[in-house]
């Protein structure tokens, strides 16, 4: 749930800054791009450090080399977040992050079905996780294409 709160909170703060007169944040698309980038920088940070073992456990057994997959997806999240902030590649970053979200969804299903934890807290159930994934996909697509 924390990534959702970062996405929503960053978007709201950016909109408030825009309403206060900062031209860049006057457009909701810019606010959404910054919010998506903030969310993915946050989620990427979990790929290293104390949460890493939890993410490795989330990878379904059918996928080989779970540690490598966690590392690669972390780098992909960072690249996508940077791309969201670089107007010439925003659309490409949007497509890449959308593909990444779909590709990582089996890990979220696995975590929900096995009631795994991240940093000691149980991951959201499958219904909640699916709704969040749809929200994240919509945000990524809207940020890149609107």
What are these regions (language model features)?
Residues 1-146:
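Membrane-interface extramembranous regions
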């Amino acid at each position: 749930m924390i990534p959702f709160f970062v996405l929503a909170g960053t978007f709201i703060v950016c909109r408030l800054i825009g309403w206060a007169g900062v031209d860049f944040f006057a457009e909701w698309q810019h606010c959404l791009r910054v919010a998506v980038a903030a969310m993915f920088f946050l989620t990427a940070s979990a790929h290293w450090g104390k949460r890493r073992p939890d993410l490795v456990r989330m990878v379904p057994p059918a996928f080989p080399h779970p540690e490598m997959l966690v590392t690669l997806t972390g780098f992909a999240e960072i690249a996508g977040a940077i791309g969201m902030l670089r107007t010439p590649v925003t659309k490409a970053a949007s497509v890449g992050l959308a593909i990444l979200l779909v590709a990582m969804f089996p890990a979220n299903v696995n975590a929900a079905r096995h009631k795994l934890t991240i940093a000691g807290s149980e991951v959201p159930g499958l219904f909640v996780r699916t709704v969040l994934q749809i929200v994240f996909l919509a945000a990524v697509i809207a940020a890149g294409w609107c």
